[in-house]
Amino acid sequence: MGCSHNCDSCSSHCGGEKSLKVAANPAASVKKVIGVVSGKGGVGKSLLTSMMAVGMTRKGYSCGVLDADITGPSIPKTFGVHGQLEGCEEGILPARSEGGVQMISINLVLPHEDDPVIYRGPIIAETVKQFWSDVVWDDVDFLFVDMPPGTGDVPLTVFQSLPVDGIIVVTSPQDLVSMIVGKAVKMAKMMNIPVLGIVENYSYLACPDCGKHISVFGESHIDEVAAHYELPVLAKLPIDPKLAAAVDAGRIEDAKLPDELSGALKTVEGLL
C-alpha cells in the first residue's frame, strides 16, 4: 500500500515522531489558541491573560481562558466567577463571566476555592489535556491559555498537546529579564511554537499629580532584549492601582484597560 503522506493516520511509524496533539472535544469550536507564558513568577502573567480576554471581547470577539496554572489558579477570582462547573452529554461546559468570557479552571472543580491542589506532574499534565479535550468551548475566536511560570510540565504539555497558534512572553523591568525571556523563547522555538512578542508588565508608575513615569522596578531593558531575539515589544504596561483593585474585587471586566495594551490586542487580532 502506498504512502498517504498523512503520518497522523499511519500505523507504520516510518515518518518520524508521531503527533502528540490531543483532539479537541467534537462539540467544541476554537479558532485560535494563544499561550501566555513567563520565565518566572510574579510578572503579572494571569493579569495580562485576563486583560487580553477582556480586550478582545470588547472588540466583538468571543473569548475563552484555559487556566493551566493548576496549582495556582487565579482566573475565576479575577472575573468574579464562583461555583462548580456543569456538564452535558458532550462534555464539560465552561463557566462564563458576566461579560461572556468562557473559562475553565481547577478552582471551579474544587469543593472550596482555598483547597490546595496537591497533584504530581503527570496528573497536572492530564488535567490540562482534559481542559482541552473534554470541554465544550462554544464558538471561541480566541482561547488564551494562562500557564504557570517556567519551562516545566505544563508548558511542555500545552505546546505538545494543544494547537497553539502563538505565545506572548510576559516579563518585568529587571536585570534578570534577558535570562528569563531567553528561557521561554528558546523553549517555544524548540517546540516550533511562534512567539508573537514580549509584554513588559509593571513597566512604570505614572505620578497621579504630574504624570511623570516612575521606574519602580528599575530601568527597562526590554527593547534590547527584544532586539536580541528579533521579537517585537507588544506593550509596556504601567502599574495601575485601580486595575489591581478591580482584579481583587473580581471586576476586571468593569476596569479601564491601559491604552498601551492596544499593540498586543492588534497582534492577536491579526491571527484571524
Regions found by a protein language model. Name each.
Residues 104, 128, 147, 160, ...:
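Glycine-rich phosphate-binding loops of nucleotide-dependent enzymes
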